[in-house]
Structure formats: C-alpha cells, structure tokens
From Swiss-Prot:
Organism whose genome encodes this protein: Musicola paradisiaca (strain Ech703)
Subunit structure: Interacts with EnvZ.
Alphabetical UniProt keywords: Cell inner membrane, Cell membrane, Membrane, Transmembrane, Transmembrane helix
Gene Ontology terms: cellular component: plasma membrane
Sequence ranges on the Cytoplasmic membrane side: 1-7
Ranges annotated as spanning the membrane: 8-28
Name this polypeptide is given: Modulator protein MzrA
Length: 124
C-alpha cells in the first residue's frame, strides 16, 4: 500500500514537472508563419470590396487563404503560406487601385519569450 502511494505521488509530481515544458513547447509553435495583408482605403470613407471579391481575385492566381476578416474600415487577409505574400500583394494592388495593401509577417520570436521580456532577445 505504501509502495503504491509512493508510485502515485511520483507520477503526479512528474506530471506537474512536465506540464510547464509541454505548455512552453506548444506555445512557441503559435508563431506559425502567418502572413497577414492589411487592406486600407486610400481615402477616408472610400468603400472596400467584400471578402468574396478578394477571395476570387486571390484564388484565380492560386493563392491560398486562411481567412478574410473585415475590421473597422479595413480588411485583414491571412494567407496559407508566407511565400505567397508578395504575389498576393501584387494581385490585390492591381485589383484594388483605391486601396493600400500592407503585408505583415510575425517575428520569429516565440510568444512566451515576448511576454517574458519587452526587449528583443539579442545574442552577441
């Protein structure tokens, strides 16, 4: 009985030690290569097309899209791969001459490290 209780306690402590490690490893993967294109009208009050129009233009050129989200007076497009960022930006600039297209790529720093320090991590 004592031996069984010791084994249960050992397993419980081992799980408590491994849990933070698992959380750190999985949280660092949240900085996947998400590329976002932020579409903003060049003139205040100018109308932007709906998400379906943007989807059609990008799909015609074989550009994969994760999501298209309207936000305030702009549209945010999340792409499937970072390699398609430049092509998608060019397609949208030609399809939407009345809008500015800004490409944003996340830093390669994991989220947990960004939260620990507001200063960028530098070596050397």
């Amino acid at each position: 009985m004592i031996n069984r209780r010791m084994k249960t306690g050992f397993v419980f402590h081992l799980l408590l030690l491994l849990l933070p490690l698992v959380v750190l490893v999985t949280s660092s993967r949240r900085t996947a290569d998400d590329v976002t294109l932020h579409i903003i009208p060049q003139h205040q009050g100018a109308a932007l097309p709906d998400g379906f129009y943007i989807y059609q233009r990008l799909n015609e050129h074989g550009i994969g899209i994760k999501s298209i989200t309207p936000e305030d007076d702009s549209i945010i497009v999340r792409l499937s791969s970072p390699e398609q960022s430049r092509a998608a930006s060019e397609v949208l600039k030609s399809a939407l001459p009345q809008a500015s297209v800004i490409a944003r790529q996340p830093d390669a720093i994991p989220i947990w490290r960004q939260k620990l320090s507001q200063q960028p991590f530098k070596l050397g």
